[in-house]
Each structure stands twice: as C-alpha cells, then as structure tokens.
Amino acid sequence: MNYFLSRVSILLLFAPIVLAAQQSDSVFMTGGKQVSLTPVVIRSGTNVPGFIKRVENDTTFYKAFKNLRVLKYTSLNDVRMFGKNGRVEASMNSKTRQWASHSCRVTNILEEHTTGDYYKDDGEFNYYTGELYASLFFSKDTVCGETNVLKDIKLSIQGKRGLDKHKEQLKMLFFNPGKDIPGIPLMGNKVMVFDPSHSDLYNFVIDIQEYKGRPCYLFSLKAKDDLSFFKKDDIVIDEMVTWFDYTTFEVLARNYKMSYNAGVYRFNVSMEVEIAKFGKYLYPKVIRYDGNWGVMLKGKERGLFTATIYDLAD
C-alpha cells in the first residue's frame, strides 16, 4: 500500500506537465551556481542546494563500472576506426565472456571478426582506441586482486607511465566525469565542473521526467555559448546530462561530451551510458563512444565503439 501511495504521489507530480510546459523556468542561486528549475521541480519542493551536493558527491555511476571487475558477464563488442575520408578502415566485432571468482577475472573470446588493419602483424593493437577498449573490458590473462571498492585515483595511476598512465586517466575521465584527474598536462581542475571557479562557465538545469517508464530527476549542465576565447579554454566537459532515479538517486543514464587540446594531448569525445541493476550491483548495460583523440607522436584517430553487457552472474 505504501508503494502504491508513493507511486500515485509521483504520478500526481507529473500530471500537470502540459500546464507546466507553458510556464517559464525559475532561476535559483546556490554555491555561486545559477540553476534553472522547471515548474515541476518547483512544485516538488526539491531542496536545490542538497540536490546539487548529492550530484556532486555521486559515486553510483563510477561504482557501476567498478562492479564489472567482480562480476561474470557476456559482452557484445563493436569497434570501428575511421579514415580521413570518413569511411571505416578497420573494425572489430566480438562476443566475449568474463569469468570472475575470488577477486580474479579473465576474459574468454567466444567469437571475433576483424577487418582492415585493426591488429598489427604481430597481433598487437594498431589503434589506440582499440587498445583502450580492450583495457576497459578485456583481461586476456587472469588478473587477481580485483575489487569494486572505490579508491583514490592517485593510487590507481601510481607506478604507471606512458600509454598505460594515459589509459587510466581517460578511464577516470570517462567513468567519473567532474572529478579532478591528476597528471593530464595543463588540465588542472578544468574537469571539476562543480568547483566555484567554474560556476560562471555553465548553465545548470534541474527537471523531473520519466526515463524508460521510471520517474527521475534530470540534471544537465552545458557550457555557455557566449564565453570568451580564454574562458572557453577552461572548459573540458562541454555538456553532461544525467538521469537519477527519483527515489534512490542512483544514476540511470548519462550522456556527455568532452573536448581538450593541450598540443601533446587532445580529444573530442561523446559518450552515452545506460545503467542497469543485477541484484545489488549496478552495471553499465550499454556504453556508446564516438570521438577522436591523439597523443603526440601517436597521431590522431577517430573511432566509435559500442559495448552491450548482459547475462550477468556473481
């Protein structure tokens, strides 16, 4: 009965949505941030400062990716690399199964098909995007000591150098956006979108919508269009849209765009992530990546990949 009443209350909150659309948003100032609230949010009585703090401190999105370290699952993998003419010049399609037990995991390739020069003659990756993808989702050899416990990023990159360090930094940037990433040249705190020094760079919006039939908060931030050249240089996360479960505040999905150019290190990336739940574990059900990036002496490459994860077991 309590669940029914709770559900009715949420539906009543959504009921006047047509009328709400005809009303203008209101602006709320908190922590130096200018946040636009839709009429439905105003009616809900949402504690805006508390909401922003929960968004800033959220760990459910990153936790979903960490949970892949301790779960068994099957993955459909689609990676495509594009040439300067915009055509696919190399690709990899595969089906893999990760086995995980007692803090150890290993990936078995069930099926794989490649085209073009996806691999070098010696079997190594010819593209950094392919190598990055493999480091995210594959473990060719058995790896032990795995955990889904969140830890300091400084510890996760400790002792890593070169491309291994860059891969770890990119993983943190992709899977924990908005938090400081140490060691990326000249980036500093530019990714810290909630830092007071970045408050005037973004438009923040809070809304209440449905995501695949579930009531949720929709939180979006987007770099302002009228920024000066030097202000634009302080932007790394261009746009981020996140759907939070209305009751649990767990992330249901996130879309984001990021770009950066420091000469030696540059990227322009869009990502879409759908989060699902297996028992007590959140996990990324679908991950879509489309972007180009490069590191000095490695050249520039554009790739697209999609990972679809299913058939989980603990």
Question: Residue spans of the language-model regions?
Answer:
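Structured extracytoplasmic
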Residues: 27-216, 220-231, 300-314
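Bacterial Sec-dependent N-terminal signal peptides
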Residues: 1-28, 37
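Gly/Pro-enriched, hydrophobic low-complexity segments
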Residues: 190-195, 212-314
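Generic marker of "main functional regions" within proteins
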Residues: 11-15, 46-52, 61-65, 137-138, ...
